[in-house]
Amino acid sequence: MRHRKSGRQLNRNSSHRQALFRNLASALVSHEIIKTTLPKAKELRRVVEPLITLAKVDSVANRRLAFARTRNIETVAKLFNELGPRFANRAGGYTRILKCGFRAGDNAPMAYIELVDRPEVAAEQAAE
């Protein structure tokens, strides 16, 4: 029985899942919009939103916690220098998931996950 077990397994072992979400979180922070499968997008939301909340208070301890969770200096720098101040007045809900059809090869449901309040420049690049 799987009572009180939160999170999706996604047919991966725990280290593979951890690496997957580290990479997806870094990609989302750097590009501000990514296309992935719907279950991965829903689970990625649980990883990225606490990171952005952590980035709202810039301290050495918070930077170290963020680095421990992402293992990427560029991601931590963007979190604390850009995204933390951008979402300082927002109390949560930093991401938006938009369904975008099904993948051609295996008919998996696909979705865009993006950061809300993206600059217009990033929105134009994503459209191209």
From Swiss-Prot:
Gene3D superfamilies per UniProt: Ribosomal protein L17
Pfam families tied to this protein: Ribosomal_L17
PROSITE patterns noted in UniProt: RIBOSOMAL_L17
UniProtKB keywords: Ribonucleoprotein, Ribosomal protein
Record-level Gene Ontology MF annotations: structural constituent of ribosome
Gene Ontology terms describing biological process: translation
Gene Ontology CC terms: cytosolic large ribosomal subunit
Source superkingdom: Bacteria
Family classification: Belongs to the bacterial ribosomal protein bL17 family.
NCBIfam families: L17
Subunit structure, interactors included: Part of the 50S ribosomal subunit. Contacts protein L32.
Protein name (record): Large ribosomal subunit protein bL17
Organism: Glaesserella parasuis serovar 5 (strain SH0165) (Haemophilus parasuis)
Gene (name only): rplQ
